[in-house]
Each structure stands twice: as C-alpha cells, then as structure tokens.
Amino acid sequence: METVRLNNGVEMPILGYGVYQVTPEECERCVLDAISVGYRSIDTAQAYYNEEGVGNAVRKCGVPREELFITTKVWISNGGYEKAKASIDESLRKLQSDYVDLLLIHQPFNDYYGTYRAMEEAYKAGKARAIGVSNFYPDRFIDLAEFCEIKPAVNQVETHVFNQQVKPQEIMKKYDTKVMSWGPFAEGRNNFFSNEVLKAIGEQYGKSVAQVALRFLIQRDIIVIPKSTRKERMIENFDVFDFTLSVKDMEEIAGLDKKESLFFSCLLYTSPSPRDIS
C-alpha cells in the first residue's frame, strides 16, 4: 500500500475505506470485508453514527491495531473546548482504542478554535497521532492554520474529477497539509460513471471509470477514501496501483474540472445536517 507522509512524519495510506452513509447495522461487516480485501485505513466520524461498528470490526479483524489507520471527526454539536474534549474520549470508547490515527474537525462551524485546542491537547496526550480539519475552504483554513500551535496535517474536502481543488491544494501545500478527498466518485452525480473521457481512458488500461478517477487523485498526491458496501466493489477500488495514467490522460481529466461543488452552493455558510454531508 502506498502511503503519504503527514507533516509530523506519520505515514498514512493514500487509499482508505470510508463509512459515510454505512448504517450502524452493516458497518461492522463492511469494515471487516474492507480489511480482508487489504484496506488498512478506515474513515469514520461522530456524525456517521457508526464508530462502534468500526471499533467492533477493528477488535475482531485479527490485524494488529498498529497496522491500521483510523480517522474520526468531531461534529459541530460537540464544538468548543469542553464539549470537544469529552466527545474525543467518547469516540475512543466507541472505537475501543486508546488513540485514533487522525482526528479532524468535521465542519468550520461553532467554536472550532476551541475544538482545535482540545484536539491539540489530545495529540499531545497521545490520543491522536495526527490532527486536521474537514470541509475548510481556503479562507477558513488559513485563518485557523495561522493561529494554531499544531498545523493541520490534513484537510478533507469534496474532491473529484469535476471539483479538483487545484488552487486550494496549492494553498494547503504551503502549510504542508495534505488534501483528502471525500466523494471521489461525486456520488455518481453529473453522469460520473458514464463519463466518456474516463471510460475511454479506462479502456486503454482495462480499468473502470471508478479506478481511473481514483488513480487520477492518487497521482495528484490526494488521499482517497472510496465507499462501497459490496465486497466486489471494494476489491475493484483497491486495485489501482498496477497502472499509471500518462501526462496526456491527466491533462484530459483535468479538463473535466468545473471548479465548483456538486453538493452545496456555499459550503462555508450553510450548516447541513450530519446526514447530508460526508
């Protein structure tokens, strides 16, 4: 498995398994399937309501905890120093672990400065190996990064072929912060899976549209966490390290970029419910 080195030296798999919209009832089975396929990075969140399923799978899978990379996120309602601090301990209890590998602020709302301070303390206490943010557009990201003690290791944002986050990624690089993609398949929107450019490129390599889309992001040094509840799709999504897109391929896919969200008209100023956003 290829990894990326975060700004504190921690190695993180560049490909992981996301459990957004995976029900609590099926989460344990899905994570066990993903680990059996070869995934070692699992992305969950307080707002997904399935941290316990992830924890059960990690306990039962037979893979040593230190070989797994677990990410969770502090939700808006747990924002602020005191609430965030308590919620981090609750997440660890549900995950049945003394630590998470990556701890993120889920949204730039509520008192996210206080939230981040609680996360910095968790990091120093060994409860998180790395910390970062999610859904922080450049202005909010810079505002936090300039005034925090520990620079965010990751910013998880909507990133796919139709919203490639090119300029935001350039800004993140200045802080040595990695971009992590949620929604790498755009949840099928904009006729993603029938896109002619992706199909034509995939035919050259004997790969699917999904595999081409993941490979494109990986070659841009973007962490990806595709989600599927079907094991055969987990296998397909995992099989992206035996080919390399050419410069021409990358340029053609770059031409698909619309530079706007397919999900929200203004993510910064609209606070969605936890069921509506990864």
Indicate residue ranges for each PLM-predicted region:
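Acidic-and-aromatic substrate-binding clefts and catalytic sites of carbohydrate-active enzymes
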Residues: 22-25, 45-53, 77-82, 108-113, ...
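Beta/alpha (TIM)-barrel catalytic core signal, keyed to glycine-rich beta->alpha loops juxtaposed to Asp/Glu
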Residues: 107-265
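A short, structured active-site edge motif that brings together acidic residues
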Residues: 66-78, 101-108, 135
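CE4/NodB-like, metal-dependent polysaccharide N-deacetylase domain
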Residues: 84-104, 121-125, 177
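Short, acidic/polar
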Residues: 23-33, 80-94
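N-terminal binding-site loop/beta-alpha segment at the start of enzyme catalytic domains
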Residues: 1-68, 185-186, 271
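Single conserved hydrophobic/aromatic residue that forms the stacking wall/gate
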Residues: 269-278
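Acidic (Asp/Glu)-rich catalytic clusters
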Residues: 57-64, 92-96, 145-148, 173-174
